[in-house]
Amino acid sequence: MPFRAALRKVPVELYPLGAAVATAVGFATYSMGKKLLADPNVHIDPTVRRTI
């Protein structure tokens, strides 16, 4: 089934919910990516591996 045909079957009332979920997923991805790239405590150095 093409995407447009499937999109027509979605009730209009669910569009704001879809937009809110997409925005939340976008913010969560941005936040997680920023944390993983910026925080030096999160990086794992392959030469130094401690058992916790």
Curated annotation (Swiss-Prot):
- Signal sequence bounds: none
What is the predominant subcellular site recorded for this chain?
mitochondrion
Quote the subcellular location field of this record: Mitochondrion inner membrane
Q: Is Cell membrane tagged as a keyword? A: no
Question: What is the annotated role of this protein in its UniProt record?
Answer: Accessory subunit of the mitochondrial membrane respiratory chain NADH dehydrogenase (Complex I), that is believed to be not involved in catalysis. Complex I functions in the transfer of electrons from NADH to the respiratory chain. The immediate electron acceptor for the enzyme is believed to be ubiquinone.
> Which family is annotated?
Belongs to the complex I NDUFA4 subunit family.
Protein name from the UniProt record: NADH dehydrogenase [ubiquinone] 1 alpha subcomplex subunit 4 homolog
Organism, scientific name: Schizosaccharomyces pombe (strain 972 / ATCC 24843) (Fission yeast)
